[in-house]
């Protein structure tokens, strides 16, 4: 099996196994798995609104997954995406609520820049610690998730009462600040599809070009493969790691503001780290950190997310719906194990 075919087959096997495991669990508990999946796909694709919701869910997933991919290419396992996304959401939300009368083009541009900066700063901290102190990026980024979560919640509680709907939730941002637009809502049956999907598509093209066609992209890939050899070749591994984490965090921050101002249109206290951050990691892993592949992986995850409530029509309880989704994520997480058993033939012959 060629390397290219392997890169395609491994994610496909992961998805098929996840769907099969979900079906087996449903059958064990006496539910009709075929009916359940029919309802899932009907809910996702059976209406224009459902399709709009798929594209709505894709926006933040693609952006956050791209952030994970950039860090991974540099050899950095960025578990801090939920915190970086939340930083972008909270800071941009605060700005939008504080200056509601800002003209829409300027407001959108300002919230994008603020999200990029906030996410980039949160991403830079573990990058600096890894580059100069050799700290474990996994531990540091996990701790950063908690720091951003609780600092963000405290910051929201300090908002002026005029912009708060309740103790834990702000009012909606103004029409100038929301990423939803009337023409997209009308086009997609009043779904929450927003301009975030366009940001995501542009980001895919930019990140693909950066990784494949620029000096920085070459340096990121070189450091990810062998930082010591990169240093010997004149590439600063420390600088590259920090830059990759700034870019990774910035993309996650942009994903966060797309989720916040595109889906919810407000800011509120979070009980735990953003699930969309971890889902973005799974999307990138499923796509083997390929920018183009991330689009397709995010589409699959969005279909599952939008279609899952429809499985209740097949009398499948919500707990089993969650198991189906978790099964996909599980096999995505272990697809590297599958990859070990689907090696290219040339590698197998070399091993002999």
What are these regions (language model features)?
Residues 141, 145-211, 350-351:
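Transmembrane helix-bundle core of multi-pass membrane transporters
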Residues 31-35, 72-89, 131-140, 219, ...:
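Short, non-helical or kinked segments that cap or interrupt transmembrane helices
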Residues 137-139, 166, 194-199, 271, ...:
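Loop-to-transmembrane alpha-helix initiation sites
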Residues 25-29, 35, 45-99, 112, ...:
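Single transmembrane alpha-helix segments in multi-pass membrane proteins
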Residues 246-252, 256-326:
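Transmembrane alpha-helical segments in multi-pass inner-membrane proteins
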Residues 1-17, 23-27, 225, 232, ...:
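Cytosolic-side transmembrane-helix boundaries in multi-pass membrane proteins
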Residues 188-266, 291-292:
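Helix-loop-helix "hairpin" substructures at the membrane interface of multi-pass membrane proteins
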Residues 58-69, 84, 90, 120-124, ...:
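Hydrophobic alpha-helical segments embedded in the membrane of multi-pass proteins
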